[in-house]
Amino acid sequence: MLDATREALAELGWGGLTMGHVASRAGVAKTTLYRRWPSKNELVVDAVASIFDELVMPDLGSLRADIEAVVGQFADLLARPETQAALLALFAEGTRDPQLRRRIREAIVDPQKRLVRQGRAAAQARGELEADTDTASACEEVDIIFDTIAGTVEHRVLVSGEPITPAWTRRFIDLLLGPLIVG
């Protein structure tokens, strides 16, 4: 059902997407959809959130290698036409609907911050980053790092239409890590 939702969204756009279209494409009754998702917004958010489940933070032995791997995974994900259509539609609709924006944050953004937390913890354990001194600052830094990486990659792919090349990734990581790396 989630695949059918993303396919229908890519084909029809937000305005054209209905629970009926998704049910027909998925081969289920509309009541089946409504039992699990009370609205189109909920269904689309879950469909988009499931795309990001495949992102993982590897432990490749260095923060640089870990970030390169995640940026590559994220760029590959964003290169898919269905992902582009789904994200752009969801973000556009979220600008008009504060509840949808909150749901996007809860179901998509906040769960993906786990990648930053995992990468930071591994880098701290390896001595690449200083240990956190207080929880509030650490949480704020996770937010800033996530926003910087996700925002930059999304903007480059979805807004500028530019590819994420290995050379671009290396330069981006140089700029990102320069002030962070311990001594």
Segment roles from a protein language model:
Residues E42, A65, A69, A85-A89, ...:
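Amphipathic alpha-helical interaction segments
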Residues A47-V48, A79-R105:
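Amphipathic alpha-helical segments used for helix-helix packing
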Residues L55-Q84, A138:
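Hydrophobic alpha-helical connector segments
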Residues K40, A47, E82, I108-Q112, ...:
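Hydrophobic/aromatic residues within well-ordered alpha-helical segments
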Residues P38-E42, L78-A79, T95-Q99, P163:
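Residues in soluble alpha-helical coiled-coils and helical-bundle/repeat scaffolds
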Residues A4-L12, D66, V70-Q73, A86-E93, ...:
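Solvent-exposed, amphipathic alpha-helical segments
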